[in-house]
Amino acid sequence: ERLADSPHLAEIREYSMRGMPIYAECGGFMVLCQELQINGKQYPMTGIFPARAEFCPRPQGLGYVEATVEAENPFHPVGALLRGHEFHYSRCVALGELEPTLRLSPGVGMSGPGHRAKGLAAEGPDNLKSRDGLLVRNTFAAYTHLFAPAVPHWAARFAAACRKNA
């Protein structure tokens, strides 16, 4: 409840609207969603992404992942291979159109095991299973925790995005 009442949520949203670079992983991903659901109760978040992060009683993603970048963004070039891990007890439910930028193999990504996001197909490219990474303006968020030494382009591209939008 304290997070939902924080004035910082509005500040984060304003920074995103102005195009400032924001890069979030896991808990940061949840803050950038429209809402967070815990024990059936919903709390408003920044609303940058039209999605709800729902906490579950069991892990929804656990283990090492490799992610292939499928959409251009300020932080990762198309075709880049990202290495990291996922460990999350929440899943992403689409409340509007979502266009994931990463394909995981292995990995669960935004959708928990056996879960389909609202309005998206059970199979094919529109399924959130094994998908991760949302982008709006210069705001990127994913459940995947990068292993930075294995993603050498990341720091330089993040710094360049910051310089460009200073």
Predicted regions span which residues?
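Amide-donor transfer/coupling interface in amidating biosynthetic enzymes
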Residues: 55-166
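Cysteine-nucleophile active-site neighborhood
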Residues: 1-75
